[in-house]
């Protein structure tokens, strides 16, 4: 598990590493719920690494910071901007990935007037009512340019080879390196991507 944070967000790291704070509370409160939570933290702490992105240079730039830690052929990326509370769409995305041996992105329908706030995908082929092969992703298009109202949400299963694309990628809109631009480059190389709609 890799967290990408800035130096200003040390509180996230402290949540896992501030042992003195937890032990002090446990001693004072003697609440079994706190003890249970602390044991959970100890378990996950061994699996967690932190990398820093101190300048907001885009999601692609942030992902590039994790390269040395990614060993598997594919990895799951979650953006904290998009909170998905009720349904664990990561679980269903992993099922789709295993079935089709493909990269997968979580998606939802957005109002056409709001497309410029999202990465938007173009459908190539319907798999079933919730899953589609895609043949294009455009980062924050105008209403005139948009291929659809299907937005890419912040959950991705991506291939390790995306790092070689990101290393050469030039900044896009807003001077940032966008992960969707790298995805589009992979699609052009005939790499399979599936959009997974969820509610």
Label for each model-derived stretch:
Residues 11-14, 22-25, 34-124, 167-169:
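Conserved beta-loop-beta/alpha segment of the NTase-like Rossmann-fold superfamily
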Residues 76, 90, 94, 98, ...:
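Catalytic-core segments of class I nucleotidyltransferases/pyrophosphorylases
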Residues 4, 51-54, 154:
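Small/polar loops that bind or transfer phosphate-bearing groups
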């Amino acid at each position: 598990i890799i967290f990408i944070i800035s130096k200003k967000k040390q509180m996230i790291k402290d949540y896992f590493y501030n042992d003195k704070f937890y032990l002090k509370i446990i001693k004072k409160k003697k609440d079994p719920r706190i003890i249970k939570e602390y044991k959970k933290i100890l378990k996950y702490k061994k699996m967690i690494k932190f990398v820093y992105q101190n300048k907001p240079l885009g999601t692609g730039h942030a992902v590039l910071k994790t390269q040395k830690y990614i060993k598997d052929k594919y990895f799951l990326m979650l953006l904290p901007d998009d909170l998905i509370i009720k349904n664990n769409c990561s679980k269903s995305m992993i099922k789709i990935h295993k079935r089709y041996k493909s990269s997968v992105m979580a998606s939802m329908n957005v109002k056409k007037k709001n497309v410029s706030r999202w990465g938007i995908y173009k459908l190539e082929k319907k798999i079933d009512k919730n899953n589609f092969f895609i043949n294009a992703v455009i980062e924050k298009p105008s209403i005139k340019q948009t291929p659809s109202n299907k937005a890419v949400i912040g959950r991705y299963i991506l291939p390790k080879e995306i790092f070689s694309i990101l290393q050469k990628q030039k900044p896009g809109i807003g001077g940032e390196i966008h992960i969707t631009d790298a995805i589009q480059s992979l699609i052009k190389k005939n790499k399979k991507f599936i959009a997974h709609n969820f509610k």
